[in-house]
Structure formats: C-alpha cells, structure tokens
Amino acid sequence: MQAMRDADTGRSSMSSPFNNRETSGDTLRVAVAGNEGGRVDKHFGAVEIFLIYDLSAVDHKLVERRAIDQLALPDEERRATIVRILADCGVLLVEKVGAAPKKLLAEAGVDALDKFKGRDIESALKELAAEYL
C-alpha cells in the first residue's frame, strides 16, 4: 500500500507522526528495516524497503511499504532519499546504522535505534510502545 503525497509538502496523506510534528492522538509512526512478520535485521546501508507502522500504546498497524528505488528522485543520493522518505517517522528500527546517517536522520527528527537488532518486529514494536507512548 502506498500513501498519496501532498503536492505542497510531499508528506504522506496517511501521516500520523510524533514529537515536533502534527500528531493524531498518541500515535508514533515507526519505520522498520526488516521483512514483514520477521525481524529487525537490515543494516541501514542495505535496506531496500522500509516497513512503516503506526504504533499506539495498545497496538500497531502496518500502513505502508516504502521502496527506496521507487521513491528516489533523479540524481538524489541514497541517504538523502532515505531521510526524505522517512521524514514523517519519529523512529527507525534498524539492525545497524553508522554515525553519519544517524546524525542526518536525527536532524530530520527521526530517532534511529539499533537496540532492537535481531529482535522480532512484533516484540520490538511492543517494547517501543511501552518506552515512547
């Protein structure tokens, strides 16, 4: 499922971001570097598709899959594409992320966490909800 993008802002119409962004109740938008139903097992540099979840204190819902190559702009660097397509997310769960991309994501308001590496996505999201919401 791919969300529609607002022509003026480029934001997803399904957006329910967190912290300094417009919120929809107590929902946190989370990007996961892993396979659906699997584990947080993709390195930042090796991810091809991000799973996007809306997370609340009581449940989570997969709302979108974002493929980097499909969303990249012409001549856009890979890191820039990733930062842009995750800008509506408050958190990125990833197996490993280097200092430079972590800083770029933080500047865009995305907290990149590798503390859930190797964990199954379901339990990682539940633990994240307990910590953040």
Please state what every model-predicted region is.
Residues 1-81, 87-88, 113-133:
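Non-catalytic interface/targeting segments
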Residues 80-107, 111:
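Mid-chain, well-packed structural core segment of small domains
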